[in-house]
Amino acid sequence: MDPKKIARINELAKKKKTEGLTAEEKVEQAKLREEYIEGYRRSVRHHIEGIKIVDEDGNDVTPEKLRQVQREKGLHGRSLDDPES
């Protein structure tokens, strides 16, 4: 997210505590917060989808649900053509 938008979120939060927000500012704050949260969720999802879990012996123990997502996206050499990947 653009640093200017984050600064605006913080500015509105501070103003809300000190003097309150107008109706327009409340709408703007909600919109900015939703945009921030969506970006955060996207980032976390991308990070988790890129994880490959291995045990002490080097065996891939990635949960099947995550493996399926990785197959769909072609991550870690996984492929929909090879269900064992």
UniProtKB/Swiss-Prot annotation:
Keyword Cytoplasm among record annotations: yes
Record bears the keyword Protein biosynthesis: no
Name of the protein in question: UPF0291 protein SSA_1878
Ranges of Basic and acidic residues composition bias in the record: 62-85
Region listing for Disordered, in residue ranges: 58-85
InterPro entries named among the record's database cross-references: DUF896
Subcellular location: Cytoplasm
Family: Belongs to the UPF0291 family.
Organism in which the protein naturally occurs: Streptococcus sanguinis (strain SK36)
Domain of life (superkingdom): Bacteria
One Gene Ontology cellular component: cytoplasm
Matching SUPFAM superfamilies: YnzC-like (SSF158221)
Chief location category: cytoplasm
Regions crossing the membrane: none
Keywords: Cytoplasm
Pfam families for the chain: DUF896
